[in-house]
């Protein structure tokens, strides 16, 4: 599993800038989906062969006891507890502040390794900038510049050095491996116990079971499944929804390890931004998705209609997923949930023949050609499969950069219907045929066209006339001389 690195520090020390540097992006979130710009930002990065996850926490105000800043501080402490390593960022220009000392005191109590990074150190004397921060007793400071990248590589390299090399990926599971994800108190633990049944009662008292994911293999109607339980499987009588915690980090880690995600919603509560955020994790990771709307038995018919309207309005980007309305406590609707998990897995792992993909593409073009972009009309020639989990279709042709988002959605729906891709995201990539001579030094130079202007023609004509006149004069002179003789 990828190590998780949390960026911590007071406001305006450059956490977001360093985050962008580590993830090599300006925004690692899922486009403009609702709810994805709040709480903690997350992103993926890689140094050499070692991948990692980065969490950009909010500005840490440890002295605030209430309000939104207090909530941000609580989220930051939770991120510290659940991360594998912590980067404590301070401002080299401002110098050491009382807030930095309070944060350092909190971080020294954490069992996670803490790396002190002095940011905004470009152009300065590293030894001088780092000197006063030794007072924090967090080891040798790393003087870096998140904006320019100075020292960032050495920092992340030292962090990842403590983690083992990623093992070669084992042969991918030939059956659904799914994770139950969702915000706190929606009934995830109840659903896990309902899925595993009465005969599978496991209590984990070992340290770390509330932080590490547990893979449990089981069978349902003769079909193999693996469930990833991030909260530990507890006895039915010990499930306490009030204290159940499922953090953003755990959701990320669970989605990374699974090939299908089961998103649990609470029908008794409104669809929240955090629901969309967690759904966005699965969508960005390209995981097949099944949505379970829990506690359906405890609401009125009027409330049910309201929930369906909210889902259509707030989770419109999950139109490919199958929705199930269940009761985990009474184990209602669980069988249908498994059918959709299996179907979503099959769709995510589908192998599509190239001839059929190209035929579907050509028929889609015949029904509706891509619109022109100025004087250019994109021309699509053929397509083939470029990957699985999620399925990727690569389209080849010319001027494909001019294809609009609406036409891409049209192609996505066409391929989804043709191959019955229910429950999985589908990605379309455009591969434009390259001109081998474009921007090449050895590009053959075009010969200039031989064009003779009107003025040149007149000059030549006048020149010929003058030449004829001179010739006539010469001949007349020579004739006179002959006659004179």
Swiss-Prot record:
Provide the alphabetized UniProt keywords. GTP-binding, Nucleotide-binding, Repeat, Ribosome biogenesis
Q: Where is this region: Disordered?
A: 435-485
Q: Biased-composition ranges for Basic residues?
A: 470-485
Q: Which GO terms describe its biological process?
A: ribosome biogenesis
Kindly give the Pfam families that the UniProt entry links to this protein: KH_dom-like (PF14714), MMR_HSR1 (PF01926)
Q: Where do Basic and acidic residues bias regions lie?
A: 457-469
Q: What quaternary arrangement does the UniProt entry report?
A: Associates with the 50S ribosomal subunit.
For this entry, the protein name equals GTPase Der
Q: Which organism is it from?
A: Neisseria meningitidis serogroup A / serotype 4A (strain DSM 15465 / Z2491)
High-level lineage: Bacteria, Pseudomonadati, Pseudomonadota, Betaproteobacteria, Neisseriales
Q: Which gene encodes it?
A: der
